[in-house]
Design a protein with these regions (language model features):
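Short helix-capping and inter-helix turn/linker motifs at the boundaries of alpha-helical repeat units
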Residues: 1-2
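A solvent-exposed, acidic/Ser-Thr-rich amphipathic alpha-helical stretch
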Residues: 21-22, 28-72
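Short, contiguous strand/loop micro-motifs
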Residues: 6-7, 38, 97
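Residue-level detection of beta-strand scaffold positions
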Residues: 10-11, 22, 31, 76, ...
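A beta-strand edge to alpha-helix "cap/lid" segment located at domain peripheries
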Residues: 52-136
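Short acidic-aromatic low-complexity motifs
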Residues: 5-26
């Protein structure tokens, strides 16, 4: 069984690669997935339905800057990128995960909506002036 940090990093990298089988295997059936300020998603099946529905329509990239664990809890600071066709939205995220029996039971992300707004504006400008596109 992997340590909790490795489980979380394997999961995020699998999402980036659209390896949904690996991503699903990292999640517990009773997953709680929350982007703070948005509706909470309960259950692995619902979360995976969301991720799979974006295949071919949106992309996800991740750069993990640092991770720390205390028992089952994993905290990470990372940069996430969401792509929608030529639109690239890159922003900072702090993630909180809980891993039990090798599977993620909690995934809670914190981010600043102003940063998302600025990233969206930069992404829109980058569609017109490619040198303005954010890069990981």
């Amino acid at each position: 069984m992997q340590n909790p940090i490795a489980t979380v990093e394997t999961f995020l990298n699998a999402l980036q690669e659209q390896d949904f089988d690996t991503a699903e295997n990292a999640l517990a059936q009773n997953l709680v997935y929350q982007n703070v300020g948005m509706p909470t998603i309960y259950g692995r099946n619902r979360a995976m339905k969301l991720f799979r529905s974006m295949q071919g329509r949106a992309g996800f990239e991740v750069k993990i800057h640092r991770s720390a664990a205390d028992g089952a809890a994993v905290l990470n600071e990372r940069t996430d990128v969401l792509t929608f066709g030529p639109l690239r939205v890159q922003f900072w995220v702090c993630g909180v995960f809980e891993v039990h029996d090798g599977r993620i039971t909690l995934w809670r992300d914190y981010f600043d909506y102003l940063d998302i707004f600025k990233a969206t504006v930069r992404g829109l400008l980058g569609m017109v002036v490619p040198s303005l596109r954010a890069k990981l």
